Swiss-Prot record:
Single GO term (MF): ATP binding
Binding positions for substrate per the UniProt entry: D20, F21, N22, R35, H58, L59, G60, R61, R117, R154
Keywords: ATP-binding, Cytoplasm, Glycolysis, Kinase, Nucleotide-binding, Transferase
E.C. code: 2.7.2.3
Binding site for ATP: K204, E330, G356, G357, D358, S359
GO cellular component term of the entry, any: cytosol
Keyword Nucleotide-binding among record annotations: yes
Gene3D superfamilies: Phosphoglycerate kinase, N-terminal domain (3.40.50.1260)
GO BP annotation list: gluconeogenesis; glycolytic process
Primary site of residence: cytoplasm
Alphabetical list of InterPro entries matching this protein: Phosphoglycerate_kinase, Phosphoglycerate_kinase_CS, Phosphoglycerate_kinase_N, Phosphoglycerate_kinase_sf
Name under which the protein is recorded: Phosphoglycerate kinase
């Protein structure tokens, strides 16, 4: 993949950059600007190089039609504050306003067009429809920079098709993500420990398949742990259970044993009989051994003994990849397992990687700073697909364009 430096002198040149600004909003207030901050190094580089930069980005899922609640206005405002620049926002995506805004940029200026998902062609499965929209994006620049790692696993007009039309490069954010994550699966420093949590085993089957080959130890928490416990013949009460994945879990346990690898499962869990996920309230929380979960209770977090065992495995590693919380961390009293894992990652003497999505928001919610970890991925789905060994369309096209 080419870097921005490889594009040569950009002063006065028009550059189109795809960023991932899909930030959480409360009304029109951004509640976590991590993704905007992650884009700053490359945007600052373009600004200082004197490029005339048009930014493509999406927010939410407006389904191919204009929806004011998904406007990029809060993003443009926050980006301007962070860069101490006047960042203009066009009134449309590829219409007269976007064209005029892009064409009137001076050297070093930055503008956003509106949410690319306001255009039906952006996420279309019809290649011709995407290509037609990509032509319009390409009219905004002489070069294309891909800097939205959270979307590189999508074959979309602003990620994939436009990169075929212009000389293209990876921004520093995408380049670092690919380097770190591909390095973990190809040649990790050992011991290599993978921590997987989250609700469903089904979502992680391909990841487990690939990482069982690469990792020395697999640490399992979150809702998916109870399907593994069931596969070992234990009763899990009212806990989340992915019946369709029990056989797969049995197979993984057997494969790990045959290959001399460890799969760590909870030895104790926190259980409740009364929980309201919407209101984020919970009744009495008890700790029970993992093989004694009462039939009328739901396990909702790993227990203190498990926290210690998992922390020890993590702290002894030279490389750690973590994706998915250990429990319902959004509810007070059920964040302890996730917090213990996050704390252990900060103490790793080696590379600690937080794999985007819920894990990234969990560490920030729980008060950890980004620089306490080796790398926090900006892509949940993208980081998992890369760890599965899949070829990501938005990366493949940059490598071809080399």
């Amino acid at each position: 993949m080419k870097s921005v430096e490889d594009l040569g002198d950009l002063r006065g040149k028009r550059v189109v950059i795809r960023c991932d600004f899909n930030v959480p909003l409360d009304g029109d207030k951004i509640t976590d600007d991590g993704r905007i901050k992650a884009a700053l190094p490359t945007l600052t580089q373009l600004h200082e190089a004197g490029a005339r930069t048009t930014v493509l980005a999406h927010l939410g899922r407006p389904k191919g039609a204009v929806d004011p609640k998904y406007s990029l206005a809060p993003v443009a405002k926050r980006l301007g504050e962070l860069m101490n620049l006047d960042v203009k926002l066009a009134g449309d995506v590829v219409g007269p306003s976007a064209t005029k805004t892009s064409e009137s940029l001076a050297d070093g200026e930055i503008a956003l067009v509106e949410n690319v998902r306001f255009e039906k062609g952006e996420t279309s499965k019809d290649e011709a429809e995407r290509a037609e929209l990509a032509q319009k994006y390409a009219s905004f620049g002489e070069f294309y920079v891909s800097n939205g790692f959270g979307v590189v696993h999508r074959k979309q007009a602003s990620v994939y098709d436009v990169a075929k039309l212009l000389p293209s490069a990876a921004g520093s954010l995408v380049a670092k993500e690919v380097e770190v994550l591909e390095g973990l699966t190809a040649d990790p420093k050992r011991p290599f420990v993978v921590v997987l949590g989250g609700a469903k085993v089904a979502d992680k089957l391909a990841v487990i398949d690939n990482l069982l080959k690469a990792a020395d130890t697999l640490v399992i928490g979150g809702g998916m742990a109870y399907t593994f416990l069931k596969a070992k013949g234990l009763e899990v009460g009212d806990s989340l259970l992915d019946e369709d994945s029990i056989d797969a879990c049995t197979k993984y346990l057997e494969q790990a044993k045959a290959a001399g690898k460890q799969i760590l499962l909870p030895v104790d869990v926190r259980v409740v009989s009364d929980i309201d996920f919407e209101a984020r309230t919970v009744g009495q929380i008890d700790v029970v051994p993992a093989d004694e979960i009462p039939s009328d209770k739901m396990a909702v977090d790993i227990g203190p003994e498990t926290e210690k065992a998992y922390a020890n495995a993590i702290k002894g590693a030279k490389s750690v990849f973590w994706n998915g919380p250990m429990g319902v961390f959004e509810i007070k009293g059920l964040e302890l397992g996730t917090k213990a894992v996050a704390q252990a990652l900060t103490e790793v003497d080696g590379l600690s990687v937080v794999g985007g999505g819920d894990s990234a928001s969990a560490v920030r919610t729980l008060g950890f700073a980004d620089d306490q970890f080796g790398h926090i991925s900006t892509g949940g789905g993208a980081s998992l697909e890369l760890m599965e060994g899949k070829e990501l369309p938005g990366i493949a096209v940059l490598k071809e364009n080399n």
